UniProtKB/Swiss-Prot annotation:
One of its GO terms (biological process) is translation. The lineage of its organism: Bacteria, Pseudomonadati, Pseudomonadota, Gammaproteobacteria, Enterobacterales. Gene3D superfamilies: Ribosomal protein L10e/L16 (3.90.1170.10). SUPFAM superfamilies: Ribosomal protein L16p/L10e. GO terms for cellular component: cytosolic large ribosomal subunit. Keywords: Ribonucleoprotein, Ribosomal protein, RNA-binding, rRNA-binding, tRNA-binding. This is Large ribosomal subunit protein uL16. CDD domains: Ribosomal_L16_L10e. Binds 23S rRNA and is also seen to make contacts with the A and possibly P site tRNAs.
Amino acid sequence: MLLQPKRTKFRKMHKGRNRGTKVNDNISFGQFALKAISRGRLKSCQIEAARRAISRAIKRQGKIWIRVFPDKPITKKPLEVRMGKGKGNVEYWVALIQPGKILYEINGVPKELAYNAFKLGASKLPVKTTLIGR
């Protein structure tokens, strides 16, 4: 179940810059959360891999919320194609992550189990993270 938008106004986007920080991004749904402390881009497959690792670690008890959604298309030109001739095709989708962004939330599990689950999930992600609680 790779995440991507159902439909967008435009197929391709400018690269843009990933600056700024998320100020006061609090826990909304769960009791414990995985919070990013560095910036980066999360692919939809990385978001799914971390979700699977977390749900397996908590043995499907409790509830998980995914607080990020990959809404930015990343394009790539085919191998051995000369420069020019337009922008490449959409290869995958990413979510831009700033420091302070809440990535996942969990409810209904003990603190130790949540910590271990988030540790397994964080190992699948390319950004540095920390565990926070209410």
